[in-house]
Amino acid sequence: MRKLLGDKGYLGRPKSRDWEDDTSEKKYRKSRRKLGPDWYFYDKRITFDYNSNGFRAPELDTMDWANSVVVIGDSFVSGDGNAIEDIATTLLQDILEMPVINLGSSGTGIDLACWNSLLLHETYPRPKAVVQLWSSIHRYAEYSTERNERSVYSFHLPQRKPYCAKHNWDERNKMYVLADRVLWKDKLPYYEASVFDVTAKVLEVDHLKEIDLGRDLDHWGPKSNIAAAETIATNLKKQGL
């Protein structure tokens, strides 16, 4: 069975971590002093547990794929800045009263989301529904031979030096999305949205707006996750889930 591509940045590190990266704790302490005891995250402990593929989920071979909803995306799906009980996929699971599999991979783009979608389609039992929360339409993955076997892709955003605008990633990613829509058409409930306003506009999908912020002050907070989960659930139910 071909394995899905997860968050390679966490592979090779402990599977359980208290911070997203090496700078997160310092940033949190600064935010704690500034925002004070009324801040939701002031005394809230968060642990990030990852499976052997780098997903914030149980091991792939233990999942009941055929009776689950699968959510694919970037760090907003994986729940950076939030405790597992507060992230959108956990809340969606509570609303739908069925398993929800989190295939969020931090920092990744539409290309990897579509690769995982294809691997899901070809290798795993067909789920009850698929949700694509599209990342920035400008991001892309680049294969690297300099990294070890578990970290073969690096991900580029427009503000980073290696970014190659000549490849016209907006148009490429639009084609990835079109292919993914065709892949799942008429097979199951399929819902698309994005937290990125430009992506939502270009792809003509729902824009899941940011209402509050997580502990890292960069991602959705608890209220945003609740709103996202409710929107996803409503749209899946409209499709017969």
Predicted ranges, named:
Residues 76-78, 106-109, 135-139, 196-200, ...:
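Short, solvent-exposed loop/turn segments at secondary-structure junctions
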Residues 49-111, 116-123:
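Serine-esterase "nucleophile elbow" of acetyl-processing enzymes
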Residues 98-104, 129-133, 189-195:
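A structural signal for short, well-ordered beta-strand segments and their strand-loop junctions
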Residues 1-70, 123, 128, 134-166, ...:
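N-terminal secretory targeting modules
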Residues 172-184:
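A short, acidic, amphipathic alpha-helical segment used as a generic capping/interface helix at domain edges
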Residues 93, 201-222, 228-229:
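Extended hydrophobic/aromatic segments used for targeting, binding, or gating
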Residues 75-80, 105, 158-175, 214-217:
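Surface-exposed cleft-lining segments at the edges of enzyme active sites
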Residues 110, 114-117, 222-233, 237:
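Short, amphipathic alpha-helical "lid/cap" segments that border enzyme active or binding sites
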